[in-house]
Amino acid sequence: MATLLRSKLTNVATSVSNKSQAKVSGMFARMGFQAATDEEAVGFAHCDDLDFEHRQGLQMDILKSEGEPCGDEGAEPPVEGDIHYQRGGAPLPPSGSKDQAVGAGGEFGGHDKPKITAWEAGWNVTNAIQGMFVLGLPYAILHGGYLGLFLIIFAAVVCCYTGKILIACLYEENEDGEVVRVRDSYVAIANACCAPRFPTLGGRVVNVAQIIELVMTCILYVVVSGNLMYNSFPGLPVSQKSWSIIATAVLLPCAFLKNLKAVSKFSLLCTLAHFVINILVIAYCLSRARDWAWEKVKFYIDVKKFPISIGIIVFSYTSQIFLPSLEGNMQQPSEFHCMMNWTHIAACVLKGLFALVAYLTWADETKEVITDNLPGSIRAVVNIFLVAKALLSYPLPFFAAVEVLEKSLFQEGSRAFFPACYGGDGRLKSWGLTLRCALVVFTLLMAIYVPHFALLMGLTGSLTGAGLCFLLPSLFHLRLLWRKLLWHQVFFDVAIFVIGGICSVSGFVHSLEGLIEAYRTNAED
């Protein structure tokens, strides 16, 4: 009797569990995620067995074909993606594809390139998140107060986490349970998430976001160059727009760049100069420590302008674009997490101290670019170094934007929208050079008509920065690794996606309002 009762209770519990699991699976399936049930697990195992046999057959065919002098001339070539296997549904690029060499030979290419150490990788990340845009952080504290300081810490934690989960999306387990790298770029991750229905949609979305962010970065360099020169020499009869035109004339040779060998020689010098400038600004602020206005640091926020501060802070931490290539070039990829921890901890401490000390020194008089608050004699010297750094930093995002445009629109073979920019001899065609010059001129026009450093940085950070750093990594992590995630990882990803979405929309709207208001003010003047 007891056995019969126990069996009935077991059957009831099993049926209830199966129903609840079916409901949860159905709900997540409608959302685009797949919850693995026992029957699905058997199906996946069966598919893996069939796939293993299929690839064994392919290997035998390859061995046979290697033993033959030549194949059938009338035979059709294999369809791209049939030989290469990828669990995400998107085929890997063929052995001769240019996608293999994007950025830095990942898992699928560039094995002959020298690998970098964790220290060198950390230096690259530091260059990305400790650049010139730190100069706008005191302006974020002006409108955010102590909450702005908290956001500098919070953004560092979240960006570090999303960088790690983005790299986790590059890896999957093979049949032997080994974790292997099956993707090599942000675009490949996005395509895998949208496969098989829309195998290229995700990559196009990421490419558009990358182009917007890179071009906006170029615009910001032109804006800050004109702003700094105008405030360094206010006595000269030269307007900020004229200084921007002069800066663009200096940058026009960037259109002729084929590689970054010439520019990379100056990267270390630029970074060292930037650290020296930060030290000079902090030293001046410390010399006025007696006059610090602690009472000006607010516990409340400016509701209209604080979302702009969020975009500024987020934009100063953006590095996710090149993390897949960077991790693929490391000698010890296992050290990537440790490298991310220390670089973001250092960035958080330095940014927080710089923003707080600078704001305490000038309080409500803090300007969009903090060096504009310095005395005339010091300001001219510091700003000249900053302009030099901005001009030498411009080619990096410009060249990256050109590469993304060329590979997405001009170098995809039969799928290209336009003919290739390069001739058969590797030389740049005249119309390709014209397009590059047009991109330089476009950055100038944007800098002339929207010469507001902080507002532009807030707009970019809210639009593409939040998308590439918060929204897409968390969404991709849920989509690709749903079956392996623990409940707290799912909670973190969903929370980051929701908070990032709210901050992105709010910051974008308020940044646009700020730009419209500033444009109207300039028109009235």
From Swiss-Prot:
Q: Write out the topological domains of type Lumenal, vesicle.
A: 154-204, 287-305, 363-383, 460-461, 511-525
Function description: Antiporter that exchanges vesicular protons for cytosolic 4-aminobutanoate or to a lesser extend glycine, thus allowing their secretion from nerve terminals. The transport is equally dependent on the chemical and electrical components of the proton gradient. May also transport beta-alanine. Acidification of GABAergic synaptic vesicles is a prerequisite for 4-aminobutanoate uptake.
Coiled-coil regions, chain positions: none
Question: Which InterPro entries is this protein grouped with?
Answer: AA_transpt_TM
Family recorded in the similarity comment: Belongs to the amino acid/polyamine transporter 2 family.
Query: Which organism is this entry from?
Result: Rattus norvegicus
Residues assigned to the Cytoplasmic compartment are: 1-132, 226-265, 327-341, 405-438, 483-489
Taking the first listed entry, what is the main subcellular location of this protein, grouped into a coarse class? membrane
The protein's UniProt keywords, in alphabetical order, are: Cell projection, Cytoplasmic vesicle, Membrane, Neurotransmitter transport, Nitration, Synapse, Transmembrane, Transmembrane helix, Transport
Q: What is this protein called?
A: Vesicular inhibitory amino acid transporter
Name the reaction it catalyses.
Answer: beta-alanine(out) + n H(+)(in) = beta-alanine(in) + n H(+)(out); 4-aminobutanoate(out) + n H(+)(in) = 4-aminobutanoate(in) + n H(+)(out); glycine(out) + n H(+)(in) = glycine(in) + n H(+)(out)
Effect ascribed to mutating residue 213 to A:
Loss of GABA and glycine transport activity. Loss of potential gradient-induced Cl(-) uptake. Loss of beta-alanine transport activity
Task: Let me know which tissues express this protein, per UniProt.
Answer: Brain. Expressed at high levels within the neocortex, hippocampus, cerebellum, striatum, septal nuclei and the reticular nucleus of the thalamus. Also expressed in islets where it is more abundant in the peripheral/mantle region. Highly expressed in the nerve endings of GABA neurons in the brain and spinal cord but also in glycinergic nerve endings. Expressed in glycine-, GABA- or GABA- and glycine-containing boutons.
| Keyword Transport attributed | yes
Q: Which GO terms describe its cellular component?
A: cell surface; cell tip; cone cell pedicle; dendrite; dendrite terminus; GABA-ergic synapse; inhibitory synapse; neuron projection
Q: What Pfam families does the annotation carry?
A: Aa_trans
Residues crossing the lipid bilayer are 133-153, 205-225, 266-286, 306-326, 342-362, 384-404, 439-459, 462-482, 490-510
A Gene Ontology biological process in which this protein takes part is: glycine transport
Top-level taxon: Eukaryota
Q: Where in the cell is it found?
A: Cytoplasmic vesicle, Secretory vesicle, Synaptic vesicle membrane; Presynapse
Gene label:
Slc32a1
Instruction: Classify the protein's membrane topology as the record does.
Output: Multi-pass membrane protein
In the record, 3'-nitrotyrosine modifications are located at 186
What does altering residue 351 to A do?
Answer: Retains around 80% of the beta-alanine transport activity
Query: What GO molecular functions are on record for this protein?
Result: active monoatomic ion transmembrane transporter activity; gamma-aminobutyric acid transmembrane transporter activity; gamma-aminobutyric acid:proton antiporter activity; glycine transmembrane transporter activity; glycine:proton antiporter activity
